[in-house]
Amino acid sequence: VGLNTYVTKEESTESSSEEESKTEVYSVKTDDIKSLEFIIDKKDTVFEKKDDSWVKKDETAFPVNQTTLDSAASALEKVEADRVLENVDDLTEYGLDSPSNSVTVTTDDGTTKFNIGDENTSTNQYYIAKDDEDSTVYVVSSSTVTPFMNSLYDYAQGEDFPTIDSSTVKKVQVSQDEDSYILEENSDGATWDVSTDGSDKETADTTAAGNVTSGLGSLAYDQFVDYNAEGLSKYGLDKPYATITVDYQEEVENDSSDESESDSEASESVTEDDTDSTEDTSGDGIDSTASDDGSSGDSSESEAAADSSDDGDSTETTTVDKQLVIYVGDNADDGSRYVTIDNKQVYTMSTDTLSAIIDKKASDLWSLIVNYQSVKTLDQLQVTYAGDTHTVNVSRETSTDDDGNDTETTTYKLDENEIDSTTFTTFYNKLVNMAGQKRLTESYTPAADAEMKVVFADTDNNQTTVTFYSYDTNYYAAVVDNKVFLVNKMTVKEMFTAYETLVNGNAKETETPTTTAEAE
């Protein structure tokens, strides 16, 4: 115990001694600082205080990040040296013969200049010299120096990328030289169509469409590059690598005072229209819906009221249609890409994030489901296999029990003989839930006759034909109209086996009809 107490006292004494040995080099109240001048990107740069805000002296429009400059000023509030080297003859040993930076602090009392030399990476310290005291070198913590060692746009206040709720995305259009597509949500709100130019639409894979929309919801800026780009060509934005146009929706709260004012203005407008119905309202073509974040809104679509509590208070919201256009330019040095949404401010954005949206063809988003036909709407199924053709007819009958509950009974007949519903739906599920591993985009000519041909007829008398050909050792080609899906050979053979079981082992003359569930 005695030894431990001694060691603890010794450590405490050493720590206290180190604190006492620190030498104050400079102190200032941050509120007294009028300007800071230091080198940024090899240029002398001055930030000065005007009306309690930092501005860039030679470029007052520059969007200075006030927090960053306040932090830099705070680093000088009390500059202390861990060591003081006096009577230094050779400044080259400390990198002070040609300083990497210099920081000049101006107050009402005058100016103080610090030259910054080399960094001692092993101790996380810098060598600095104050004013023109060339023979004295101070060793200070890196926290005193690093706030002044950044690039210009590290001192800029950028904007956040507009928030997109991926669940509200209605349409995505990507325009590139070769890889362009249009992805559109269907009216059911659950499925998507994809095309190259808006025509010849194909059903989109739900997961692939979800990856695109979730990618949009994840977009964020990396680095702020230019707040007022006059030459977009240096970022490749005069002729963008890709243009992304997103139609989405946003819920906004209505301000009650704004609503009252709007209602009043609307009333006045109606009066004016009644007074002069011949006034020209054709407009000059200017889009008055454009917003500062690069998106446009139309709040005329729909309105909804949401109760916020049980005391009768409610918040009225409006569903606003928005459109955001994102221009994607060249690669930056770090591998990211330059982007802009207003052709003025330029940022970088991760290529990993963008890759969820760009560099895709419409075919990359195609659904690979060969042909889904719900059993609830199936009327007839005709199958030709191994030289024989069999037909399954579906009939439905609704009965009502004593309590008034309706029950639908579905009966399946194979060539006029009733068959077990479970055996049929086992085969049918394998048939309609079949997915290809890829689709051929080039023309296809079968090398042999079809091994199976299936004709679907639904309750609306629509017919679809699916034909299966052996493609190679790994795949069958499932052909639907002009679409050719390559399906794993084992998947197709399992379906063939289920069909053989249906035909060879389960046909029967009579069976009590059973209620069946939807085929998955």
PLM region spans:
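Soluble, acidic/polar mature domains that operate outside membranes
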Residues: 1-520
